From Swiss-Prot:
Annotated InterPro entries: Bact_microcomp_CS, BMC_dom, BMC_shell, CcmK-like_sf, CcmK/CsoS1_BMC
Protein name stated in the entry: Carboxysome assembly protein CcmO
Gene (name only): ccmO
Subunit structure: Homooligomerizes, possibly as a trimer, interacts with CcmK in the carboxysome.
Taxonomic source organism: Synechocystis sp. (strain ATCC 27184 / PCC 6803 / Kazusa)
GO terms assigned for molecular function: structural constituent of carboxysome shell
GO biological process, one term: photosynthesis
Location in the cell: Carboxysome
UniProt-listed CDD domains: BMC_CcmK
Alphabetical UniProt keywords: Bacterial microcompartment, Carbon dioxide fixation, Carboxysome, Photosynthesis, Repeat
GO CC entries: carboxysome
Region of interest (Disordered), residue spans: 1-29
Family: Belongs to the bacterial microcompartments protein family.
Length: 297
């Protein structure tokens, strides 16, 4: 079992305030507003369940003003709202918790802009809350006057049957309500044991068991955040960057520089200078004697 879960309730959404155009879009010409008030949280939940199952109306939510006063707000056509309010008031009278009832045909847009009674607020509340893992199960509510009596009753209920503590609700005037979920048989057994424990510790104020919840009632009941599966955004699919493996350079051994014999260029042979024979000056001065032979005829 979870320890010390964070408890949250789903009250009637109060912000943002809608404009007149948005209100007129959600408001049919024959719409009506119905309110039934009790002085017990289990009683108002049972009253709202009867109102939803008796006619085609939409449960906007609950308005808790303190001192134990709770009001269920429904919307729908005029005839459906009148029937739902009458059935809800009759149920609250059976519990001995009815305070007042009201039907308003065709409420003005200004009324919806100020009070949290617009049917479009149901959509806002559903968007802010995720899916509960305790949905589609029976519900049991046990209300005590005083916090210790409620905690002791909740502990006894969890130990006596296979149920889960969904949440708790405080409405003022010392009234606290423990909410358990499970099968019909387990919830009935848990509530019976919890009643005995609450009377032993303090004051038992009211109890309620609802075997089957409608969707509108399911969305308006408080539930701990531990049991909620919040819608998470899908991860963005981005291409994976493939990193190329860097090649490691292999260090080569230093090779000794081989001495390569270089051919020495031979000097080109110089051209031999032919010196002309020197002629002595004396020899040059001598006349050249030409010897002529005898002429032969």
């Amino acid at each position: 079992m979870p320890t010390s879960p964070t408890m949250t309730s789903v009250p009637i959404a109060r912000s943002p305030r809608p404009s007149y155009q948005q209100i007129n879009q959600h408001q049919p010409s024959d719409s009506a507003l119905g309110l039934v008030s009790t002085r017990s949280f289990p009683a108002i939940v049972g009253t709202a369940d009867m109102m939803l199952k008796s006619s085609q109306v939409t449960l906007v939510g609950y308005e808790k003003i303190g001192s134990g006063y709770c009001t269920a707000v429904v919307r729908g056509k005029v005839a459906d709202v009148r029937l739902a309010v009458e059935e809800g008031a009759r149920t609250a009278e059976q519990f001995g918790q009815l305070v007042s009832k009201l039907v308003i045909p065709r409420p003005m847009p200004n009324l919806q802009a100020v009070f949290p009674i617009g049917s479009h607020l149901v959509e806002l509340a559903q968007q802010q809350r995720g899916y509960s893992r305790l949905s589609n199960r029976s519900i049991g509510l046990l209300e005590t006057r005083g916090f210790p009596a409620m905690v002791g009753a909740a502990d006894a209920m969890l130990k006596s049957a296979d149920v889960q503590l969904a949440s708790y609700e405080i409405i003022g005037d010392g009234l606290c309500t423990a909410i358990v979920r499970g099968t019909v048989a387990n919830v009935a057994m848990a509530i019976e044991v919890g009643m005995q424990e609450a009377e032993r510790i303090g004051e038992l104020h009211a109890v309620m068991i609802i075997p089957r919840l409608l969707e509108d009632l399911e969305h308006t009941l408080p539930v701990a955040t531990y049991w909620l599966d919040e819608n998470e955004p899908l991860p963005m699919l981005l291409p994976n960057q493939v990193r190329e493996k860097q090649r490691q350079l292999v260090a080569l051994p230093e090779l000794e520089k081989a001495v390569v014999p270089q051919r020495q260029a031979k000097p080109l042979p110089l051209q031999e200078k032919t010196e002309a024979p020197l002629v002595l000056e004396k020899e040059a001065e001598k006349p050249i004697v030409e010897v002529l032979g005898p002429e032969i005829d």
